[in-house]
Amino acid sequence: MYSNITKAWHEDPVKEITSKLSKGYFNANKNNKFENERSSEISDKILDKNPKYNFLSTESDLVSLTENNLHLLSNNSAHISDLNSSEFGNYAPVDFATKIKPHNISNKHLPLVSSKDSECDFSMNHIKHCNICYGRLKELINNKVSKKMDEIILDNKIKQIQSFVPSLDNLSKSNLTTDQSMNNQNRNTISNNDLWKTALIIIIGIVIILLLIIVMIKTVCK
């Protein structure tokens, strides 16, 4: 259960929102529920008598969601005064962005529907009968869900990359340490070989000197 319509709008699916609205969860006075249901029945009768505004009727002229010709009464219909005007079919009587009460044109022509309803109940009643607004609302929710899923997937990818990069750093450090140790060993081996060579040269030199001394002594003794 949500404390206000804004929280429900951002966190609740479309059908669950409309279900909670129809049950009067957002009403300050629960006794208004029966009055709202009565208003909804009256609204149904009005729409049945006037199929132009009954979007479930086959006689209504539905506006495609792919076209950018659907507007909001509260923002764009101040100049429309005739319900029979062809322009009126291109407007939806609820502004979900600001959640304000319907425009006076709605109150004027449909007083039994909107005069006693809260703005939440009026929106719910309209969504129940208007395939266009329900489709738009569903499209908005789907876009929000898709955007959130993209953010979650991107976040997971970033975390995977971040977890993978330290392992590469550790591997690079271990390889560097191994190379350094091998270089040190090679240097030690080379230095040891040089020492042996030097010692061998010295020994050979001493032996040669001794042989020369012996030869010289023998020569002198003769």
Curated annotation (Swiss-Prot):
Q: Which domain of life is it from?
A: Viruses
Transmembrane annotation, as ranges = 200-220
> How does this protein lie in the membrane?
Single-pass membrane protein
Q: What is its main location?
A: membrane
Sites where a glycan is attached? 4, 75, 84, 104, 170, 175
What cellular-component terms does GO give this entry? membrane
Q: Where in the cell is it found?
A: Membrane
Its keywords, alphabetically, are: Glycoprotein, Membrane, Transmembrane, Transmembrane helix
Q: Identify this protein by name.
A: Uncharacterized protein L448
**From which organism does this entry originate?**
Acanthamoeba polyphaga mimivirus
